[in-house]
Amino acid sequence: MPTGDYDSKPSWADQVEEEGIDAEPLSPQIRKPDPVSFVLDTPREVINGNIKTITEYKLNDDDKTVKIVRTFKIETVKASKVVAQRKNWKKFGNSEYDPPGPNVATTTVSDDVLMTFITNKEDLNNQEEEDPMNKLKGQKIVSCRICKGDHWTTRCPYKDTLGPMQKELAEQLGLSTGDKEKAPGAEPEPAQAPVSKTGKYVPPSLRDGGSRRGESMQPNRRADDNATIRVTNLSEDTRETDLQELFRPFGSISRIYLAKDKTTGQSKGFAFISFHRREDAARAIAGVSGFGYDHLILNVEWAKPSTN
């Protein structure tokens, strides 16, 4: 049987295998990266007014070309010099070659968050109890001898006006009660009846001065009527202490009467204030009448003498 050499055409698979053996492997710099992050072209930026558009092309998982368009709105915000200098700092790491400003791929700018620190009320109460200075806040450490205010007597604003008046009043009261020496030429006091030493009860009508039946009270009452003023247009929240603080700078006060409602206990809007001296009452009328107090205009006038 004749034999001969026959030229056979190489198959396509053999050619591909031979090319794969002869070809050199691709370097890691040229090797195709992961299709998810592979960028076909550099991003293109287009700025139109305050609108910035970035367009780029990538390959997805199916090895298909995808076009990504991102649109940004440019806003101009005034910042302090320190913030502006901090934005010009040189970047490092993976963001070394990024342009100025935050990179949306690595940086997320969120809204400002306002923080409110809430403390426990029990802790505050414990601190107030432990602090000795807080206990002294409600106490009156310093008291003025002239106006009874919370300041030193040497710094009293009424020292020049009330000081001499109080001294003169103290001298008058001392002479009337016999605390000081009697003035020359004064009438001698009547001799008092001897006090019973048996320890028995003596009715007031049989005591010394019992027959006069209050004659000694008449001059004092007339003096109070002459130095009594009437204050009207008071608020419902007014108290005797408020009137004491309001009229005390004008002179020594002997009596304060504030008309109150029997059921509610609130002020009826008027009060009577009696001074020891008529001059002090006149000065109080001139100083307080027309004065704004507790959102009301006070009216001060002389009180009409009682008929009884």
UniProtKB/Swiss-Prot annotation:
Lineage: superkingdom: Eukaryota
Entry's localization field: Cytoplasm
Record-level Gene Ontology MF annotations: RNA binding; translation initiation factor activity
GO cellular component: eukaryotic 43S preinitiation complex; eukaryotic 48S preinitiation complex; eukaryotic translation initiation factor 3 complex
Comp. bias (Basic and acidic residues): 209-226
Domain RRM: 227-305
InterPro entries per UniProt: eIF3_g, eIF3g_N, eIF3G_RRM, Nucleotide-bd_a/b_plait_sf, RBD_domain_sf, RRM_dom
Pfam families with a match to the protein in the record: eIF3g, RRM_1
Keywords from the UniProt entry: Cytoplasm, Initiation factor, Protein biosynthesis, RNA-binding
Annotated CDD domains: eIF3G, RRM_eIF3G_like
Example of a GO biological process term: translational initiation
Bias type Low complexity, positions: 185-194
Annotated region described as Disordered, given as residue ranges: 1-35, 177-226
Keyword RNA-binding annotated: yes
UniProt subunit comment: Component of the eukaryotic translation initiation factor 3 (eIF-3) complex, which is composed of 13 subunits: eif3a, eif3b, eif3c, eif3d, eif3e, eif3f, eif3g, eif3h, eif3i, eif3j, eif3k, eif3l and eif3m.
Similarity-based family: Belongs to the eIF-3 subunit G family.
Function: RNA-binding component of the eukaryotic translation initiation factor 3 (eIF-3) complex, which is involved in protein synthesis of a specialized repertoire of mRNAs and, together with other initiation factors, stimulates binding of mRNA and methionyl-tRNAi to the 40S ribosome. The eIF-3 complex specifically targets and initiates translation of a subset of mRNAs involved in cell proliferation. This subunit can bind 18S rRNA.
Protein name listed in UniProt: Eukaryotic translation initiation factor 3 subunit G-A
